[in-house]
């Protein structure tokens, strides 16, 4: 019997051409992919096969996703955004732009900023497509919100924090508009994510809102004391802060989410001026969180040898925030007005710095003079290390904290470790110069030499910022170099 094989011109779509597979034939045009290669979700890579766009999408899956999940897995980044990018051009182009700027960020030194013409082209295209999509009545609500979220990341990577915050506020307004679809409101007016809503678009909106809240906490800790609009935006978008649930934490990411409200309660103006009963309620919430966290670690993460690097970093990060919050409560309860009250927590500050080193991977052996670059949009250690340097007078601990901030080039959401270290070092130098002698221990810095307040003012449209250090009498301004 003679078999006739019909020849069909291959359309060069990987891993198998549609002209072959659509008619039930096997495509012989390509060898099998290597088992070690990264496979993009079906539809994403094929759109830009063998192009710079495909390369950026692969960089996103290999590098950017890992960075964005350095502490906690995130279903929004890992699954939802990639799925939506298959069918939505503005999200696909935004992801390509983000990957391009991220790649540039990893290549450059601390004195340079990402400047990708390729990335900028796709960024501008994504903006135009997002505006066009949002003007259509039939457009699903999660698309412009996801676009805005990715745009915030791109602005952060370019060092344009003021622009990133403006975009963040715009995203909050969109979330507020779609609030009834995302969550339910209890009798106290607080908004809870509604677990009963199972629409894929609504679940994506819930995940996006959760990430916006994490970014909000970062911004709160950066400029909350000078940006009154931020306080309003937070309350309108995320409601009030909530009591903790009695049920145990199921994972480290859930413990992180519960921590956010406690951080916001303490952020400026925070607990200042609160009466004893309110401070007690807040202290109870912290103790409850600590109990739930300890139970989770004892149950699922007690064997240190079996922990992954991500889990070790996440636990250390949460321990840093735990001690930060506990110390803050003690200050509000017993030490308001005393700039030297922090001296009693010197040992705790040292322990926090050690945990910060674990969270940033500095506890692991590296070749000498090896510095890495990191980018993520989660809460990080730079804000806490800055507060330690501002509070602790001990010169050794201060320099140890600055060393961690300078060891790697980290963009932790809106917090840049290198710039935060510069601001913290300037604070330390101010206090030491005002002490009038060589500082060898905490007591060498007198109370009148202490910096009482630090305010950060972002320069509109620029990569620079102004820091104002307030003393008991007078203040001093300093421009942070870009």
Q: Over which residues does each language-model region extend?
A:
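Alpha-helical solenoid repeat scaffolds, predominantly canonical TPR units
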Residues: 122, 129, 167, 348, ...
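Long, well-ordered mid-to-C-terminal structural blocks that present hydrophobic/aromatic surfaces
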Residues: 285-355
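Intrinsically disordered, low-complexity acidic/Ser/Thr-rich segments used as protein-protein interaction/activation
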Residues: 33-88, 92-101, 106-284, 302-315, ...
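Residue position in alpha-helical solenoids
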Residues: 129, 136, 174, 296-299, ...
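C-terminal region signature
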Residues: 71, 371-379, 395-482
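N-terminal cysteine-rich, zinc-dependent DNA-binding domains of eukaryotic transcription factors
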Residues: 1-31, 71-72, 139
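Structured C-terminal portions of repeat-based eukaryotic scaffold domains
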Residues: 337-388
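Amphipathic alpha-helical protein-interaction segments enriched in hydrophobic
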Residues: 141-149, 307-332, 371-399, 403-406, ...
